[in-house]
């Protein structure tokens, strides 16, 4: 009887506990939109850290953003005022939870002063006007949630995982301008939108182990084209700008370790006269200029990286501001033109503003502080056709584009004029011989007499004549191939056009060399290969040559395009990201192509945005661009330590924002405002969790005479000023004890007695 009474008592206690415990209602995320009538004054009240502050703004165009520890409030005034309130709290741990400001104290608590929370804005008007009847267009917001449970001891925890996806880029139709505001250089805007570079990103995930840790990695390949194209915007009035000329020339590359004396190149079909004799061991004299745009190869770089910006513009009217950023500082200069480019770098986010009325092309150059030269066996040289190049270490070098070239390294011998004749048809021929080699000079008589060797090869050497093909020689048994349409003479070691020895078939007074235009070839010992196209000659010398290195080096010449350059950059980000970037630049096309970028992401960092853990908070910064009636753009950049604002003349605004390998391009045509939120995660100390952190406030004041569409990213719309509009539900992380199990457990213990 006693045991039965105790069992009944335990059941009553369990029932009472089940009735007392109530599951709290789920938290929500909501947006509240408030409209202010006409153009007047708006008073915004912001509360943080136990106090409230009030600030008044003259409505015309006003942008105000406030971030409170994961809570973003956005105010946009266009003449009506639009106020948007968004509350998001997310975590990167077991679940991603979204809460509203009306969260329960046991979930999200912070001190709130009296008088706050009634309303976030107070509107004062000087005249009574009607509220707009049409709703403001906003981007769509999609949310997906999955529910589940997990157990810990005798507790059952219900979880809800929600993923919030927002539309990052927005577009608007062209707003025609009936009257241009005192801007004679910019006519009415056309409906042609500027072309933007294409961005393609592919990512692959994987894991790697280190001791007992499993690290998740994500490798992303980003390909970008730096130059942009757009159709020209017609100008009604062009101001002459004599200070800005069209620069079409290029800086030629010089040969390291040698002096080059050049004269203008000759045209095909004519002969070139030059002094045949040169002193042994001295630099030779050649007839053209050096090859512009020669390649630059760098090896491994240090972990520190430098990003610079180079802007190429077309000249017409107005002013261009070019900003070059290097490390932690930026410098600006102003040039008279018709294009304005503003580049802003804020906490790792690069924002580019381009206003044009004709065309702007911007190149982003990533270089390293210290570079090392390439080692033999892996070097490569690309030469530009139409001009010949010859690189010879030591003190001699000669290049002859459009004609013949001769390179004589080391102790090369001088040609001996006399009765010998040289027939050289313009085109491109070359002769390169290392060691004590000799070379012929086109347009004059010359004979090759290095040592006692000349145009024949004793032993196993052979001479072949094959039309239309280039020669290739290997050390040891030299081979000379004479092509009709291309001439070449290459021998490694101490041979020149022939292998040194005692045999000679060409002596001064009787020797003759015939060279026809086409393509010349040069060879280096080992396994090196040379590819050359018609119309250009190249010469490479093994040994300490700076152009090519023996081993597996190669020389390629492509017609119609200039040479390019490649460089490597390795950087380590602030959150443990290690990035390796290899960039190749094409001089002719003006484009910069970035090869796949590998990004290793440690597993301790979350890839979802926004994210925050139990000891983390979301820090949001904004980059806002506003264009007002083809006149002025005001750019405000905000980080967690403050905001900076500057203005510039504009009519068209192009904003490019790159965040976590996602590039977003915004194009505005007259009075559109676009805001991009940049999220970062910051650790918080435990004692700060219950405090309200005021992160950043952005204010942008301007006036406009014409109504404009309101663009509010990431928000939904409601004309109700109350804070009870719910768009979707998040997880309450409710903890429901299994009371039945506890009661059964107690009953079993009682029956044991």
From Swiss-Prot:
Main location (coarse class): secreted
Gene Ontology CC terms, in alphabetical order: extracellular region; fungal-type cell wall; side of membrane
Propeptide intervals in chain numbering: 731-753
Carbohydrate attachment residues: 702, 719
Sequence repeat residues: 253-260, 265-272, 289-296, 373-380, 381-389, 390-397, 398-405, 406-413, 414-421, 422-430, 431-438, 439-446, 447-454, 455-462, 463-471, 472-479, 489-496, 497-504, 505-512, 513-521, 522-529, 539-546, 547-554, 555-563
Record membrane topology: Lipid-anchor; GPI-anchor
Bias type Polar residues, positions: 261-302, 555-565
Subcellular location: Secreted, Cell wall; Membrane
Comp. bias (Low complexity): 241-260, 367-554
Signal peptide: 1-18
Lipidation (GPI-anchor amidated glycine): 730
Example GO BP: cell adhesion
Region (Disordered): 241-302, 367-565
Posttranslational mods: The GPI-anchor is attached to the protein in the endoplasmic reticulum and serves to target the protein to the cell surface. There, the glucosamine-inositol phospholipid moiety is cleaved off and the GPI-modified mannoprotein is covalently attached via its lipidless GPI glycan remnant to the 1,6-beta-glucan of the outer cell wall layer.
Keywords: Cell adhesion, Cell wall, Glycoprotein, GPI-anchor, Lipoprotein, Membrane, Repeat, Secreted, Signal, Virulence
Upregulating conditions: Expression in regulated by NRG1 and TUP1.
Taxonomy, superkingdom: Eukaryota
Free-text function comment from the UniProt entry: Cell wall protein which mediates cell-cell and cell-substrate adhesion. Required for biofilm formation and plays a role in virulence.
Record family assignment: Belongs to the PGA18 family.
Protein name: Probable GPI-anchored adhesin-like protein PGA18
Source taxonomy: Eukaryota, Fungi, Dikarya, Ascomycota, Saccharomycotina
């Amino acid at each position: 009887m006693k045991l039965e009474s105790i069992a009944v008592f335990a059941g009553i206690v369990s029932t009472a506990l089940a009735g007392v415990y109530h599951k709290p209602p789920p938290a929500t995320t909501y947006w509240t939109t408030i409209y202010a009538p006409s153009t007047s004054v708006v008073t915004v009240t912001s509360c943080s850290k136990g106090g409230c502050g009030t600030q008044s703004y003259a409505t015309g165009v006003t942008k105000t953003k406030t971030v409170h520890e994961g809570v973003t409030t956005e105010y946009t005034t266009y003449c009506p005022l639009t106020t948007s309130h968004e509350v998001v709290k997310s975590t990167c741990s077991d679940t991603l939870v979204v809460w509203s400001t009306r969260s329960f104290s046991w979930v999200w608590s912070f001190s709130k002063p009296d008088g706050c929370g009634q309303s976030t804005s107070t509107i004062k008007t000087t005249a009574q006007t009607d509220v707009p009847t049409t709703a403001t267009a906003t981007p769509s917001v999609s949310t997906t949630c999955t529910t589940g449970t997990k157990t810990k001891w005798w507790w059952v925890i219900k979880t809800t995982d929600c993923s919030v996806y927002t539309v990052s880029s927005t577009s608007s139709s062209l707003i025609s301008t009936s009257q241009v505001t005192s801007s004679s250089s910019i006519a009415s805007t056309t409906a042609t939108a500027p072309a933007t570079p294409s961005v393609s990103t592919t990512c692959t995930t994987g894991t790697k182990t280190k001791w007992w840790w499993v690290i998740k990695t994500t490798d992303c390949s980003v390909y970008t084209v730096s130059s942009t194209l757009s159709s020209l915007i017609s100008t009604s009035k062009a101001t002459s700008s004599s200070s800005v000329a069209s620069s079409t020339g290029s800086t030629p590359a010089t040969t390291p370790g040698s002096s080059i004396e050049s004269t203008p190149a000759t045209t095909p079909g004519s002969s070139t006269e030059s002094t045949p004799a040169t002193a042994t061991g001295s630099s030779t004299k050649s007839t053209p200029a050096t090859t512009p745009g020669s390649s630059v190869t760098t090896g491994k770089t240090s972990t520190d990286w430098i990003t610079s910006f180079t802007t190429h513009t077309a000249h017409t009217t107005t002013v261009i501001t070019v900003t070059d950023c290097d490390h932690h500082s930026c410098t600006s200069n102003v040039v008279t033109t018709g294009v304005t480019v503003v580049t802003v770098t804020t906490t790792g986010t690069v924002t580019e503003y381009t206003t044009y009325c004709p065309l702007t092309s911007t190149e982003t150059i990533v270089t390293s502080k210290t570079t090392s030269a390439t080692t033999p066996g892996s070097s490569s040289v690309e030469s530009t056709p139409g001009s010949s190049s010859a690189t010879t270490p030591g003190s001699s070098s000669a290049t002859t584009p459009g004609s013949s070239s001769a390179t004589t390294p080391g102790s090369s011998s001088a040609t001996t004029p006399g009765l010998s004749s040289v027939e050289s048809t313009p085109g491109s021929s070359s002769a390169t011989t290392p060691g004590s080699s000799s070379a012929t000079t086109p347009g004059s008589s010359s004979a090759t007499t290095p040592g006692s060797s000349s145009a024949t090869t004793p032993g196993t050497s052979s001479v072949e004549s094959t039309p239309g093909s280039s020669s290739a020689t290997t050390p040891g048994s030299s081979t000379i191939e004479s092509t009709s349409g291309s001439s070449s003479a290459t021998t490694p070691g101490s041979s020149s056009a022939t292998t040194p020895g005692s045999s000679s078939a060409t002596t001064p007074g009787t020797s003759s060399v015939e060279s026809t235009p086409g393509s010349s070839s040069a060879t280096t010992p080992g396994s090196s290969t040379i590819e050359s196209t018609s119309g250009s000659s190249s010469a490479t010398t093994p040994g300490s040559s700076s152009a090519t290195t023996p081993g597996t080096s190669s020389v390629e010449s492509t017609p119609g395009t200039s040479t390019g350059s490649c460089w490597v950059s390795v950087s380590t980000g602030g959150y443990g990201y290690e990035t390796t970037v290899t960039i190749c630049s094409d001089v002719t096309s003006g484009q910069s192509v970035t090869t796949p970028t590998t990004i290793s992401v440690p597993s301790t960092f979350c890839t979802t945005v926004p994210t925050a853990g139990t000891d983390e908070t979301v820090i949001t910064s904004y980059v806002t661009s506003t264009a007002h009636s083809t006149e002025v753009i005001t750019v405000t950049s905000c980080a967690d330590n403050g905001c900076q604002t500057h203005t510039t003349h504009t009519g068209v605004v192009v904003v490019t924002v790159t965040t976590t390998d996602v590039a977003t391009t915004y194009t505005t045509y007259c009075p559109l405002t676009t805001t991009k939120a940049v999220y970062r995660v910051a650790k918080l100390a435990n004692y700060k969790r219950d405090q309200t952190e005021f992160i950043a406030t952005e204010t942008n004041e301007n006036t406009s005479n014409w109504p404009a569409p309101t663009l509010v990213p990431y928000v939904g719309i409601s004309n109700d000023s109350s804070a009870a509009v719910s768009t979707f539900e998040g997880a309450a992380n409710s903890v429901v004890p299994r009371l039945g199990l506890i009661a059964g457990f107690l009953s079993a213990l009682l029956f044991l007695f």
